[in-house]
C-alpha cells in the first residue's frame, strides 16, 4: 500500500521522479498496519507462514518517515543554496499528501495527532522553502489549523522533542510568510509548554541533556551551537542514525560526512527515508526476540544462529549500532548471553549508571528501552557483577513506581499492553516462570502493530506482525493437543500401576505432567516428558510413604528390594503398599531404560537404579534423624537434604531422552553433579522457607530452623530466611552460568537446560505457597494443558 496521492499537478522536470522506487515501495510495506488480532485468522498453511517469517531474516523493512523525508528535502545543494540537494524527496512529498491535507501514515493511530501535525508542518516548510506545491501547502496549512488543538492535548502521545521542535517550526513558518490562523490561547499554551521544557533542560547540566538537545537540533533554531552537536557524529556520518537531525546539521555546517550518510540512505531507500537508519542489528534481534518469546524459535534455528553470530561479531568490534543505542545494547546483551555467548555486562552497567546519575530523564529512554534494560540487568552470572545487582533492584523499584502511578499509559508502542508486560517482568522474573507459562503470557500480551515512537512514529514487520502471532498460536495449540493426550496416558499409567490405591499418597499426576509440559514442550520430546512426569508421580508417592504412609520396616524393605532388583514381589514384599510401590518403580525404570537404550546405544538401567537408591538412602537418613531427635549441623543437613528433595529421579533419567548422547564419562563428570546439586539446593531451600512454620509445629528440622539453632538462636527468623534467599540467589546464578557456558562444558546444552528448567519449576511451585498447595497453580495448569488460545480473544 502506498501513501495516498495528491491530485495536484506535479512541478517541473527537475523535481520529478518515479512515484515510488522499488526501494521506497519496500519501505511502504512497513507502513501497512497489520491485521488486528480480532480479525486475524489462523493460516491455512503452517509452512507458508513459516516461509514468510523466514524471509524477514533476509531483509529489514522500515516504514517511511514523512517527517524525516521533509527535513532531507530541505537540504540545499552543495553547489547552490537555491536548489534542493534531493529533488526526489521533494517530489515524493508532492505525490504523497493525504486527502485530508496531512502527511500522515496510512491508518495512523488516533493518539498520534501530534506526530501527524509535526510531520505535516515539516512537509509544508520543505515545499515552501523551494517554492513548489502551492496547492499542497494550502491544504496542509488548513489541516494544521483544524487540528492545532491536538498540539496541547494531554491524551495524545508526545513524540520526543515535540514541545520544542513544533513551536520552532511554527516560527520558521512565520519567517517564510506562511499564514497560519491559529487560536491564540492554544498557541500561548504551546509556547508555555516549550518554555517549561527549555527551563527544565537548562536546570540540568547532565550529559544526557546535551545528547537530547543534539538529537532535536533541528528544533533549536539558529542560536544552536552546531559545532557542539557534531561531537555526536557517528562513523557513518550521521547524528544518532537520524536522517532529520543529520539533514539539519548538513544544512547548517555543510559537513561532507553528513551528506554522504544522506546519499547512502537515499541510495538504499529511494525517494523517502525512514526515521532511523541503519537499524539492521536491532531489527534482526527483534525478529529473534519475537520468535523466542513466542515459543517458535525452534523452526528457525539456522537463521537465528546466523543472526547471533553476526551480532556477536559486531559486539566484539564495538559496533556503534549496538553500543550507541541503549535498547539495541540491552537486547543484544540479553540475547547473546542467554544463548551462551561470552559478553561482558559492563555496557549495561554503564547505561544504568548514566541513567541513575542523571537528574534529566524521560526524553532519551522510552518505555520499551527501560523494559529491555531491566530484562538485561536480570542476567547476572558472576560475583563481580555486584553493581548490576544494585542497579537491577533500583530499576525494579522505578518500574513499580511507574506502574502504580500509571506512568506507562503513554507507551512508546501503540496498542501495546505495556502495563501487563512490565507487571509480568516484575511479578515473574525469568527464573520464576516456566517456559510455557511465559510463552502463553507473551502471546496474550503480543501486539502486532508494534509502532515505535521517537521524534516521529515508525515501524517494521521485524518488530512485530500477524505472522508471528498466528504461527505461535497454532503451534501452542498443536502442542497442547499432544500434551492432553499424554496426560490421559499418564492417568491410565497411574491406574495400571495401582498407585491410586495408595490412600496415603497425594494424587498429583496432573501437576507432575504440567511441570514437564511447561518446560520441555516440543512434540518430539514426548519420551522425556513422560519420564519426567512418571518419576515425578513416583517421587511424590515415595516421599509420602516415607513421611506418613510407611513403617520403618516397610521403608527398609523397599530399599532392599531396589538394591536386589530381581526379586519375587509376591514373596519378598512385606506389605501390599511396598509391593505396589516397588512394582511401579521397577516397571517405570525398565520402560525408561529401554527407551534410553535405543537413543544412547548403551544400557542405562543401572544408572537409573542408582539415582533412585541415592534418593531412598537420603530419605531413610532423614527418617532416622527424626526418630533419634538429633540435630545435624547445617552442612550435614544440606549434604543430605538436597538429595532428599527428590529431583534426581525426575531430571536425571530424562537427560537420556532429549536427544544428545550422554557417555558414562559425562554422567560421572563433576559438571553433571554440580548442576544437580545447585538445582536441588535451590529447591530444598525454597521448600524449607515455605514449609518452615509447618515443619516447626510438627517438630521437624529445616534449613531455616537449623540456621537459627546453629547461630545460638541469636538471629531472627527473618534474618535466617534472608540468608537462605541469598544462598538461593548465589546458587541460581551459578547454575545459570554453568548452563549457558559452552567453552569449558562437557555436557550437551540440551541436557543442561533441563537443570535450569527444573529450577524455574521449583521457583514457581514455592514462590507463594508450599509446593502443590498453591491455589493459583490450578489455573496455570489449565492454561498450559487444557485451554487452547483463541486468536480472536485478544
Curated annotation (Swiss-Prot):
Mg(2+) 3 binds at residues 687, 695. A motif (DDXXD motif) lies at residues 543-547. Its EC number is 4.2.3.19. Binds 3 Mg(2+) ions per subunit. Keywords: Chloroplast, Lyase, Magnesium, Metal-binding, Plastid, Transit peptide. It comes from the Eukaryota. It catalyses: ent-copalyl diphosphate = ent-kaur-16-ene + diphosphate. This is Ent-kaurene synthase 1, chloroplastic. It comes from Isodon eriocalyx (Plectranthus eriocalyx). The lineage of its organism: Eukaryota, Viridiplantae, Streptophyta, Embryophyta, Tracheophyta. The gene is KS1.
